[in-house]
Curated annotation (Swiss-Prot):
Membrane topology according to the record: Multi-pass membrane protein
Catalytic activity, EC: 3.4.24.-
Designated name of the protein: Zinc metalloprotease Rip1
Active-site feature positions: 22
Length: 404
């Protein structure tokens, strides 16, 4: 029951985020003197609407987005006589950019507010975790039977049998110096047989010989970064866990921006990798193992939201919602039509072009002809809709689950 409740709550949270995105456009458009004709949540047939002043507000049947209709967003629109002077395309560049940025800016603001609240209530990941290969726990070596799923095992592992303890710092594996846990794990994966491992304990270097055990792990294959099963070495250790850090009202502010900055970098990497994930999504639809690194749709996001609520992980629920708002902001700022970023690019181009013409003693040119940009816009739409259908299908037939 809580799983279903979580799905509904997260879907509602996404809808509210989209509605606030459109509110951002509407509020700034009004403040800069533009006319907002309609503000609707959802698509399809209208379920309810009312008119307040010059704006019609309403709710439509399909709760998968929303829109804010601003008069004269492009020069090809038909305008009523009272709208011509207030048409968006006739306004100063800074006003147009402000209106267009306000939507993604609202999603960014939601992300910052949520992360700030998390910093105060639950705490944020440690911004300065140990960079050395600190051992957190030792145990047996379990086979990774499927991606992310380990089989049961008992007894001590190779590291424990060799005397390695929690808190030890690994500095060398065989002839390979290591300065982080990832470097240590990579060196162990390439090793076999009895290997000397140097650890630091209470400031003293200790050499111990560890019998590397062969096991199966899912690791990147080096071609697009897709995970594939491979036989590698393992010694049965885990990295030391660093708990979250709680902040005060003022100290949470820089921490919030720092975490958001890190997330922004990761979102950029994820967007750049989208084309490489098509094959993994197709295989998942065909019954293959679903790579947890593949993109998800609103459906998949809601399922993950349901998992977090079902297990009482409200901090994960809100953090995931913050990430999703950051992703919405980043996607909408892509300099491609029909995204907000595409319209911003057109406005900036017109401004630069007219500045150059003015410097040459020429009058300002006519606004960009959006009809000529329609073919490129349709290509982007087809690619976006196609990718959305692919992710929705994968999320319906083979969703990413956090606790399975």
């Amino acid at each position: 029951m809580m799983f279903v409740t979580g799905i509904v709550l997260f879907a509602l949270a996404i809808l509210i985020s989209v509605a606030l995105h459109e509110c951002g456009h509407m509020w700034v458009a009004r403040r800069t003197g533009m006319k907002v004709r309609r503000y609707f949540v959802g698509f399809g047939p209208t379920l309810w609407s009312t008119r307040r002043g010059e704006t019609e507000y309403g709710v439509k049947a399909v709760p998968l987005g929303g829109f804010c209709d601003i008069a004269g967003m492009t020069p090809v629109e038909e305008l009523d006589p009272d709208e011509r002077d207030r048409a968006m395309y006739k306004q100063a560049t800074w006003k147009r950019v402000a209106v267009l940025f306000a939507g993604p800016g609202m999603n960014l603001a939601i992300c910052l507010v949520l992360i700030y609240a998390i910093a105060l209530v639950w705490g944020l990941p440690n911004l300065h975790p140990p960079t050395r290969a600190v051992i957190g726990e030792t145990g047996c070596v379990a086979q990774e039977v499927s991606q992310g799923k380990l089989e049961q095992c008992t007894g001590p592992g190779p590291a424990a049998l060799a005397g390695i303890r929690s808190g030890d710092v690994v500095v060398k594996v065989g002839d390979t110096p290591v300065s982080s846990f990832d470097e240590m794990a990579a060196a162990v994966r390439k090793s076999h047989g009895s290997v000397p491992i140097v650890v630091e304990r209470d400031g003293t270097a200790i050499v111990t010989y560890v019998d590397i055990e062969s096991t199966q792990r899912w690791i990147p294959n080096g071609q697009g970064g897709e995970l594939q099963p491979a036989t590698v070495g393992a010694i049965g250790v885990g990295a030391a866990r660093v708990g979250p850090v709680r902040y005060g009202v003022f100290s949470a502010m820089p921490a919030t921006f720092a975490v958001t900055g890190d997330l922004t970098v990761e979102v950029g990497k994820a967007l750049a990798a989208l084309p490489t994930k098509v094959g993994a999504l197709v295989r998942a639809i065909g019954g293959g193992q679903r790579d947890p690194q593949t993109p998800i749709s609103v459906v998949g996001a809601s399922i993950i939201g349901g998992d977090t609520v079902d297990h009482g992980l409200w901090v994960a629920f809100w953090f995931f919602l913050a990430q999703l708002n950051l992703i919405l902001a980043a996607i909408n700022l892509l300099p491609l039509l029909p995204f907000d970023g595409g319209h911003i690019a057109v406005a900036v181009f017109e401004r630069i072009r007219n500045m150059v013409r003015s410097a040459r003693g020429k009058v300002a040119a006519a606004p960009v002809n959006y009809l000529k940009l329609l073919p490129a816009t349709y290509v982007v739409l087809v690619l976006v809709v196609g990718y959305m259908l692919l992710t929705v299908t994968a999320d319906l037939v083979n969703p990413i689950r956090l606790f399975q």
